[in-house]
């Protein structure tokens, strides 16, 4: 592309110019051909790729033609095979295709990301939450592809476990959060891959610590729901949950949170009746049951007292805000006026 006698060099500058000037070259087929040619040229020259990667990403984000966007995604996948470092540095912009309104663009993006991630061509940097959204996509083909991706990813040691905190945060809070029903359905599938007892114990500890970092009831419900999806087969799991009681004690007045912990208690009883080697003891179960009931009762009382205090404080503030003017007492300006009139008379 840069040799003095190279035939392709004649088109090296023409192709980006056409892609960048859609008003001057509005023909849709010309734009599609130029975008494809740009992708192919980028695969044969690192210098050309680095110079025009920004343009290709711009086409993926702003092109009004879904065919151009879909081809740009595939082209980025091919470029990643040739020059993985360049694409890896801009991988977060590739994930944007998962939110495209066009089914073809979304499906191509999901397939390209699946190929690149599973083959280690790009690193996952906290963006698995966007892929997890596809598990509940309305289009069955997208949903099935997402399930296949996570099933293959789970075959890699600790891959899903290591990214679980980021997935939960991405789907539960912030601008990327999904509704609670979608969150629950997604987590039910994701947590099927957390099947090792050691992993479950660590997740229990990490999730419980999140209770103290948020003041939103939605987040409390999401955390409690995730805790209810974990297996509780050993004494260590119960101990982790009991030791973390100070983190969630004051949240148990929320019905959904308490319900999730009640389901956890039911799982513990099931674990006791199973033939697991490290099953929880009767003492552990009674201790957790008593602690849970007492904490829930205390939390309800504290919450009721807090509401009553806030109500009383609001009444006092409104009372002090009223003007203190006696009935029938004239204002100072009026009294001054009458005095002035008497003097004149």
What is each PLM-predicted segment?
Residues 1-121, 196:
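Alpha-solenoid helical repeat scaffolds
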Residues 1-17, 129-135, 141-345:
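Long internal repeat-built scaffold domains in very large eukaryotic proteins
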């Amino acid at each position: 592309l840069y040799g003095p006698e190279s035939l392709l060099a004649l088109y090296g500058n023409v192709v980006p110019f056409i892609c960048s000037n859609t008003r001057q070259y509005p023909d849709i087929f010309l734009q599609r051909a130029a975008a494809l040619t740009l992708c192919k040229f980028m695969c044969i020259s690192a210098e050309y790729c680095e110079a025009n990667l920004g343009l290709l990403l711009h086409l993926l984000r702003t092109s009004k033609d879904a065919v151009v966007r879909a081809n740009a995604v595939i082209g980025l996948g091919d470029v990643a095979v040739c020059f993985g470092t360049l694409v890896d540095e801009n991988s977060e912009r590739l994930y944007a295709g998962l939110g495209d309104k066009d089914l073809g663009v979304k499906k191509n993006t999901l397939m390209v990301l699946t190929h690149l991630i599973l083959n280690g061509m790009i690193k996952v940097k906290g963006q698995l939450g966007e892929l997890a959204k596809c598990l509940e996509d309305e289009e069955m083909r997208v949903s099935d592809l997402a399930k296949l991706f996570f099933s293959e990813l789970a075959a890699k040691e600790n891959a899903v476990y290591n990214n679980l905190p980021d997935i939960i945060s991405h789907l539960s809070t912030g601008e990327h959060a999904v509704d609670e029903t979608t969150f629950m359905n997604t987590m039910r599938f994701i947590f099927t891959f957390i099947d090792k007892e050691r992993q479950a114990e660590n997740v229990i500890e990490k999730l419980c610590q999140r209770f103290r970092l948020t003041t939103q009831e939605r987040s409390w419900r999401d955390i409690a729901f995730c805790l209810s999806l974990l297996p509780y087969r050993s004494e260590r799991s119960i101990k982790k949950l009991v030791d973390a009681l100070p983190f969630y004690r004051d949240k148990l007045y929320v019905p959904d949170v308490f319900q999730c912990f009640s389901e956890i208690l039911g799982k513990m009883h099931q674990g006791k009746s199973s033939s697991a080697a490290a099953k929880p003891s009767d003492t552990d179960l009674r201790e957790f049951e008593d602690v849970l009931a007492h904490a829930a009762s205390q939390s309800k009382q504290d919450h009721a007292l807090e509401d009553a205090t806030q109500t009383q404080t609001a009444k006092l503030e409104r009372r002090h805000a009223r003007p203190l003017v006696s009935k029938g007492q004239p204002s100072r300006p009026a009294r001054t006026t009458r005095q002035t009139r008497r003097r004149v008379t």
